[in-house]
Amino acid sequence: MKIVTLFSDGSCLGNPGAGGWAYILRYNEAQKKASGGEAYTTNNQMELKAAIMGLKALKEPCEVRLFTDSSYVANSINEWLANWQKRNFKNVKNVELWQEYLEISKPHKVVASWVKGHAGHPENEECDQMARNEALKIKDENKI
C-alpha cells in the first residue's frame, strides 16, 4: 500500500456562512492540490469536506497520513467515529458528511494528526489560504 500525505483545511466566513475547503495530497515528489466551497455551511463541515475531497482524489487504496488543524476531524476519525456508528449516529452533527467519509475511506487506512493552525506549518498555511480564498470568492459571488 502506498503511503500518502494529505493536508486539509476548511474556512468559514461566519458560522454558518460562505465556506471553503482545500487539500494538498502528496506521494513522494508528486503533489495534487484542490479547493472548492459552498454558499451556506459551517467550519466543521468545510474541515471534513476537505478531508473527504482529498480521499476522493486517490486512485487506489493507500495508507493516508492526514494532517488537519481541526481537532473535530482528527478526534472524530481516530476516536469517536466507531462509537458513533454503534449508536447509529444518534445526536451527531454532519451525519451525511460522516457517512460519505466512511464510504470513501473504506479502501484506505487513515490516521489523522492534529496540527496547530496558523503556527507556520507550510502546508496547513497554504491550505488555509486556498480555503479562505474559496470562501471569499463564494461570498462575493453570492453577495452574502
Curated annotation (Swiss-Prot):
Q: Any binding details for the cofactor?
A: Binds 1 Mg(2+) ion per subunit. May bind a second metal ion at a regulatory site, or after substrate binding.
Catalyses which reaction(s): Endonucleolytic cleavage to 5'-phosphomonoester
Q: Which Pfam families match?
A: RNase_H (PF00075)
* Enzyme class, first EC level, given as a word: hydrolase
Q: Which UniProt keywords apply?
A: Cytoplasm, Endonuclease, Hydrolase, Magnesium, Metal-binding, Nuclease
Where in or outside the cell? Cytoplasm
> Taking the first listed entry, what is the main subcellular location of this protein, grouped into a coarse class?
cytoplasm
GO terms classed as biological process: DNA replication, removal of RNA primer
User: Which PANTHER family does this one have?
Assistant: RIBONUCLEASE H1 (PTHR10642:SF26)
The entry's family comment says: Belongs to the RNase H family.
Assembly and partners are described as: Monomer.
Q: What is this protein called?
A: Ribonuclease H
